[in-house]
A protein has these predicted regions:
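Acidic/proline-rich low-complexity IDRs
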Residues: 1, 37-40, 117, 141
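A broad, low-specificity signal for short, low-complexity segments enriched in glycine/proline
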Residues: 1-5, 21-25, 73-74, 119
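Extreme N-terminal leader/targeting segments of oxidoreductases
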Residues: 1-18, 36-38
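Conserved N-terminal/central alpha/beta ligand/cofactor-binding core
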Residues: 8-10, 45-164
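N-terminal Rossmann-like FAD-binding beta1-loop-alpha1 element of flavoenzymes
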Residues: 18-42
């Protein structure tokens, strides 16, 4: 049994198909990606809307312009990683990034724009302008969009103030 702080209600563990531990960007997105027919318990150690993801000011790197390429993004990432990167993981992340950006926009994330196109910046070890932002609050914008969708899903119960 689980009793979130400030609640008299107990939550039985055996009612859940999936338990997601952590409600930062990864936990929120994982919860949203699960099929609607599954009952999901999302456990969050924080009682307020706080997470490391929310404080992230950096942007999201993605190949979205014709003068860029997956190969160049992979090369930049591996160079910056100085031998610490898992090549297969880097390849997957780089190739999936444009789809993730599209998905985030469908969910309601509004990236900075220059006229009618997504605005990109040149940062860190990137050799092309490929970093997308929401002002200097990209992490906050990301988490807020994901939280809004999690809270609207009837199959997801988001419990705050739970230590696992």
């Amino acid at each position: 049994m689980l009793r979130p702080p400030f609640s008299k209600n107990l939550i039985e563990f055996n009612n859940w198909d999936v338990i997601v531990i952590g409600a930062g960007a990864a936990g929120l997105m994982a919860s949203l990606e699960l099929p609607d027919n599954l009952n999901v318990l999302l456990l969050n150690r924080n009682t307020s809307k706080v997470s490391s993801s929310r404080w992230a000011q950096g942007g999201i790197a993605s190949v979205i312009k014709p003068d860029d390429s997956f190969e160049l993004h992979i090369e930049d990432t591996l160079k910056a990683g100085d031998g610490l990167c898992d090549i297969k993981a880097v390849e997957m992340l780089v190739r999936e990034a444009p789809n993730c950006v599209d998905n985030l926009q469908r969910l309601g994330m509004i990236f900075d724009k220059n006229l009618d196109q997504l605005s990109t910046t040149l940062e860190a070890a990137h050799s092309c302008r490929r970093v997308l932002h929401v002002k200097d609050r990209t992490g906050r914008a990301l988490v807020e969009v994901l939280e809004d969708h999690v809270e609207s899903k009837k199959n997801i119960l988001h419990c705050r103030g739970v230590r696992v």
